[in-house]
Amino acid sequence: MDDKQHTSSSDDERAEIATSNQDQETNSSKRVHLKRWQFISILIGTILITAVITVVAYIFINQKISGLNKTDQSNLNKIENVYKILNSDYYKKQDSDKLSKAAIDGMVKELKDPYSEYLTKEQTKSFNEGVSGDFVGIGAEMQKKNDQIMVTSPMKGSPAERAGIRPKDVITKVNGKSIKGKALDEVVKDVRGKENTEVTLTVQRGSEEKDVKIKREKIHVKSVEYKKKGKVGVITINKFQNDTSGELKDAVLKAHKDGLKKIVLDLRNNPGGLLDEAVKMANIFIDKGKTVVKLEKGKDTEAIQTSNDALKEAKDMDISILVNEGSASASEVFTGALKDYNKAKVYGSKTFGKGVVQTTREFKDGSLLKYTEMKWLTPDGHYIHGKGIKPDVTIDTPKYQSLNVIPNTKTFKVGDDDKNIKTIKIGLSALGYKVDNESTQFDKALENQVKAFQQANKLEVTGEFNKETNNKFTELLVEKANKHDDVLDKLINILK
């Protein structure tokens, strides 16, 4: 068994699964945070990221594998005996791998810890891709729109771009097989494969349809984006993966080259990731020998400190950090450190509040056990678990950008009373329709506005909020949020 401590971020499909209208399993609530390309997958796919942080390279002090006492040995023997009995004597033949997994799942479930889990070999592969930012594919962002799989954009320099794939190309077949009715994640799985193998996409561009052969390659998805907005540099950090610190350093240097003194570090909806990357990133702004985070297990505490001098180009910069309730884990470690040392002012809304650390142990068969091992505190000793980090200046997110996903399996009509109806009203109001209340009642006034929405969008006019109406409703809200980042605009106005 390979015992190592590294990250667990989201099961984010990244470059080849940008958006989806399919209902997918979530780990917690179904609250949605809309934010540029990041939030598209979250809103339409109903995928919420359970924020997880684990440690790379920090072996906790005095960690030892202890021998089993008599009770532990007795329990272990009992588990082994039950496994043997069921595997050999049960009247129906059993799958030994499934029995083993069920036993492990049962132990993990008993922890009642949302951050501890056992991953199969396949799940571990996806998990590790999330850590590294690397996967094998063609490098094309996709979304499901109007029941079609459409390319949002090919990544620069990717196999997809070199093969001539363009934005708005509609994929109709993969390797000659129709993808009609398939969920986006199923299509992504078909498109991906082994390195140096070929995949043939049938793409529709206008009235033309053609086959495009693309060689799969290892793709790296960057976790940092830099944009200049007037006299402010906006650096968006999507997750904490391998070399995010290097990408952040490059972005800061670009901002310095552009002559910018005011920098916004946008951590909204960043679920976290590698702890050592958070420490390295904090070191860009915090001098050598300073504590970035404290790890605590029982009575033992270890302070993780910066090892280098701060980046000289960053020393005179006015740093602002933008967060929301989707900013979690390593995002909170980074934010907490800069806040405690007065290196940055924090804006937005209260963060998620995850103050525990997971360790992973990988087994020879490729499966992996992830479990909570310790908690962490900010340099000043603040334990933010379940509390989050409060911003210095609150900038509220517009209601429509924090809506719960409405299940598209449900239809709502006059006389219904449901919490999702309030979501419908808030969304329609944001889209410019006249809604006079935000109750959970589906009244005649709402029916009239739903009819107006259906007519305006060339849908069957029924007055009922059905699947087709829901899909268009969601699509338009995403487009609105994509075009108007109200929170960021407010912050930039504050910084002027």
Curated annotation (Swiss-Prot):
Q: Which residues form a coiled coil?
A: none
Q: Which residues does the entry assign to the active site, renumbered to this chain?
A: S329, D340, K354
Annotated GO biological processes are: proteolysis; signal transduction
Keyword set, alphabetical order: Cell membrane, Hydrolase, Membrane, Protease, Serine protease, Transmembrane, Transmembrane helix
Task: Spell out the Basic and acidic residues composition-biased ranges.
Answer: 1-16
The record's subcellular location field reads: Cell membrane
Which cysteine-cysteine pairs are annotated as disulfide bonds in the entry? none
Give the EC class as a word: hydrolase
**Protein name stated in the entry:** Probable CtpA-like serine protease
From which source organism is this entry?
Staphylococcus aureus (strain COL)
